[in-house]
Amino acid sequence: MKRDHHQFQGRLSNHGTSSSSSSISKDKMMMVKKEEDGGGNMDDELLAVLGYKVRSSEMAEVALKLEQLETMMSNVQEDGLSHLATDTVHYNPSELYSWLDNMLSELNPPPLPASSNGLDPVLPSPEICGFPASDYDLKVIPGNAIYQFPAIDSSSSSNNQNKRLKSCSSPDSMVTSTSTGTQIGGVIGTTVTTTTTTTTAAGESTRSVILVDSQENGVRLVHALMACAEAIQQNNLTLAEALVKQIGCLAVSQAGAMRKVATYFAEALARRIYRLSPPQNQIDHCLSDTLQMHFYETCPYLKFAHFTANQAILEAFEGKKRVHVIDFSMNQGLQWPALMQALALREGGPPTFRLTGIGPPAPDNSDHLHEVGCKLAQLAEAIHVEFEYRGFVANSLADLDASMLELRPSDTEAVAVNSVFELHKLLGRPGGIEKVLGVVKQIKPVIFTVVEQESNHNGPVFLDRFTESLHYYSTLFDSLEGVPNSQDKVMSEVYLGKQICNLVACEGPDRVERHETLSQWGNRFGSSGLAPAHLGSNAFKQASMLLSVFNSGQGYRVEESNGCLMLGWHTRPLITTSAWKLSTAAY
């Protein structure tokens, strides 16, 4: 539905505008009439979900009141607005009907003394967010206009009555802006303050106007995202399509993490509406591998995952002469140099270290796992660790069989199995996770380390998954805001954006981002014959020290839960490291 609410801008006028007002009124009436003839229900839905407390059937009366307000404001002298109450409801323009009534009543008070310093009327601007008024369809409504009162002497006040506030494009105007972040229900909103100072030819300041784009747009953006997801769940794609277009405009008005998160979720929603699934092929896997390296360099989440898992493995290998690690998430092998160095420094000398890496095939059919193994072999030679390596290419961990791993007797070789952000990808394949856990039982490891996202993105209801993922990734993006701008940071955001796109836009086996919480994984592991192995207090202390490198540790938080370690941002856990072993009944 078309709307005639526009961005507030300062305007000075003491001339009548009855003829133009009449023309505007007719246009408004015709526009409202057209809207009432068709699409009224859709307009009411859009108004409701975006927080506007007015019906399309009331727009004719709203248009008349707008005309009255415009006429009254254009006829009020410069001192005619000083009586406006500071607590009047026009601070909430979403309630259009009551807002207009209160504005009209405020503009018709007893006359004030001539000496009072007032301000000139504020009239709607014909454009918002760069869209012409004729195309304006529930676009973002900015915040309030707040006036500062400059010192004006009596000799200059009479001259000011005939002046209009100049636009910011004037060479005599100066614009400054600042922004601060605020958190709204787990999503970051932004308050943008713009100060415009207009000067005369002599350089004198005549008026200062501060336009404040408050948290209202951020709240409206979140409501639009949720409403769009709900419309998709109800298969109301017409409404969802209209809402996703609104989200784009609302996101532009934000800054920082809020804008980035909303943009990625808007893209994912659009892909789901128009059935444009993101690619799921070998090239995409290779790209994700590269993006994960940037994510590793940018923030502590992967470093925390590797460090805590390595600490658990190191303790489990204590006193063993031959050790074997089977890595379900080999990728670039970033986890293992630190473990190899720790083994090299072990009292009594390093053990013989065997590493089996499992990863997806490369798009060019190159043996990238072999290349990773060669680099690790060079490191092992430099630190005097006897090293053996073998790589396995598999499209899925569910294709793995224990007989492929060349297992040796447990009394001669201790085995550890490691998985970082891999097991959740099996949940979309029927029987996939059960098969892999069965292979783990056949391996009989002394320890099975698992790192997964601490969130439930695998429920049967799309709206619930969307809500949880919106909060989760908003927190993740917020934690990245303290990182200096760099290519690593940009690529890290793309890495997370790809996860959002898969989680929201895909279904069935194509949806691989099926994260679950620690309690859910605990139930799965318990039913497969695995028992928790508590991580030691030493791992907790050293993980806390690791975080001090990132943003001086501010914002990040490590906490222990049932023998597992969680890393979060402020009060929200984001990833969890857990360790498991075969239960007594499994032997």
UniProtKB/Swiss-Prot annotation:
UniProt lineage: Eukaryota, Viridiplantae, Streptophyta, Embryophyta, Tracheophyta
Subcellular location: Nucleus
Residue span of region VHIID: 292-357
Motif VHYNP motif: positions: 89-93
Gene: RGA
Similarity section: Belongs to the GRAS family. DELLA subfamily.
Residues of the GRAS domain: 212-581
VHIID, short sequence motif: residues: 323-327
Keyword presence, Nucleus: yes
Role of this protein: Probable transcriptional regulator that acts as a repressor of the gibberellin (GA) signaling pathway. Probably acts by participating in large multiprotein complexes that repress transcription of GA-inducible genes. Positively regulates XERICO expression in seeds. Upon GA application, it is degraded by the proteasome, allowing the GA signaling pathway. Compared to other DELLA proteins, it is the most sensitive to GA application. No effect of the BOI proteins on its stability.
Induction (free text): Upon seed imbibition, increased GA levels in the epidermis reduce DELLA proteins (e.g. GAI/RGA2, RGA/RGA1/GRS and RGL2/SCL19) abundance and release, in turn, ATML1 and PDF2 which activate LIP1 expression, thus enhancing germination potential.
Gene Ontology molecular function, alphabetical: DNA-binding transcription factor activity; promoter-specific chromatin binding; transcription cis-regulatory region binding
Annotated stretches, region: Leucine repeat II (LRII): 371-403
Subunit-structure text: Interacts directly with the GID2/SLY1 component of the SCF(GID2) complex. Interacts (via N-terminus) with GID1A, GID1B and GID1B (via N-terminus). Binds to bHLH transcription factors such as MYC2, PIF1, PIF4, PIF6 and SPT. Interacts with the BOI proteins BOI, BRG1, BRG2 and BRG3. Interacts with NFYC9. Interacts with TOPP4. Interacts with FLZ5. Binds to zinc finger proteins MGP/IDD3, IDD4, IDD5, BIB/IDD9 and JKD/IDD10 in the nucleus. Binds to and coactivates GAF1/IDD2 and ENY/IDD1. Binds to PDF2 and ATML1.
Residue ranges, annotated region (Disordered): 1-26, 152-181
GO BP terms, alphabetized: gibberellic acid mediated signaling pathway; meiotic cytokinesis; negative regulation of developmental vegetative growth; negative regulation of gibberellic acid mediated signaling pathway; negative regulation of leaf development; negative regulation of trichome patterning; positive regulation of DNA-templated transcription; positive regulation of gene expression
Biased composition (Polar residues): 153-175
Domains (record comment): The DELLA motif is required for its GA-induced degradation but not for the interaction with GID2.
Motif (LXXLL motif): 423-427
Main location: nucleus
Region (SAW): 505-581
Organism encoding this protein: Arabidopsis thaliana (Mouse-ear cress)
Motif mapping: DELLA motif: 44-48
PTM section of the record: Phosphorylated. Phosphorylation may increase the interaction with GID2. Gibberellin (GA) induces dephosphorylation of RGA by TOPP4 and subsequent degradation by the proteasomal pathway.
Pfam families linked: DELLA, GRAS
A cellular-component GO term for this protein: nucleus
Protein name in the entry: DELLA protein RGA
Chain intervals for the UniProt region annotation (PFYRE): 415-502
